[in-house]
Amino acid sequence: MIEQLPKYMKRKLLILVTAVVMQMSFAQTESTFGDGEWFKFKMSYSGWLKAGNATLTVKETTLDNKDVYHVVGKGWTTGMIKWFFKVKDRYESYFDKTTLLPYKFIRDIDEGGHTKDIVIQFDQKDNKAYVHDKKKNTKKVFDTSPNIQDMVSTYYYLRDRLDVSKMKIGDEVRVDMFFDEENYGFKLKYLGEDIIDTDFGKIASLKFRPYVMAGRVFKEEESLTLWVSKDKNKLPLRIKADLRVGSLRADLEAFKGLKHPFRIIVDN
């Protein structure tokens, strides 16, 4: 059918198709985050006692000749809390810059004497996870779901790819995640829009309920609430968690390297 069109119409059609493809490509490549992004959080226990700090850092690098984001998350207790419950956690994820699928995950934690030192290599093509437990000196291979995510990459994947404009309050999304030697169906519930007071001022936000595994740390599946900025950055502004003993709150207190403008609501 196209071959039967006049030459000038073919040229116009080609220009139109090219323009559409360029727009689609632009929409797919305009990510919410990038190289050099850095967050710092302050944590408090049961609403008043300073508990610690956490940071998230994004760097561009290569891994096995693949262009990846390398994200490092650190968390540690401070002050009085540190004397009776010391926490020193480090999480790392190397995930593809285009697909946001992870190739390598590192979990090195010490939480009140509960320690883990694990490295996971993901084979996204053959759906395998190669788990090296350095503490136990064991190596195991597990089958994974297609397009599997790790604990860290899940957050960046949802932050970048979730289209909230198409969601209603109560809607849930599911992501296949590999955690602690098993496939885990991570779920996130949308709770609507909110305006919260922060160290930076009033911020329009989106509110979510990440489902967590109840057990040693969390009181129940719906123990966690997350607020992210209602802009292109999707900044993690606040996290509240109901623990088996007390509660924990993390608030964003510093940031740099944002890709998009950060908006604050100014009272008239």
Language-model features: locations:
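Generic detector of intrinsically disordered, low-complexity segments in short proteins
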Residues: 1-2, 267
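Position-driven detector of the extreme protein N-terminus
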Residues: 2, 23-25
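Positively charged n-region of N-terminal signal peptides that target proteins for export
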Residues: 3-13
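Hydrophobic-ligand-binding modules of eukaryotic lipid transfer/binding families
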Residues: 10, 25-27
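Bacterial N-terminal signal peptides
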Residues: 15-23
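Acidic, serine/threonine-rich low-complexity disordered tracts
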Residues: 28-124, 164-268
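Hydrophobic, well-structured mid-protein blocks that either form specific transmembrane helices
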Residues: 118-162
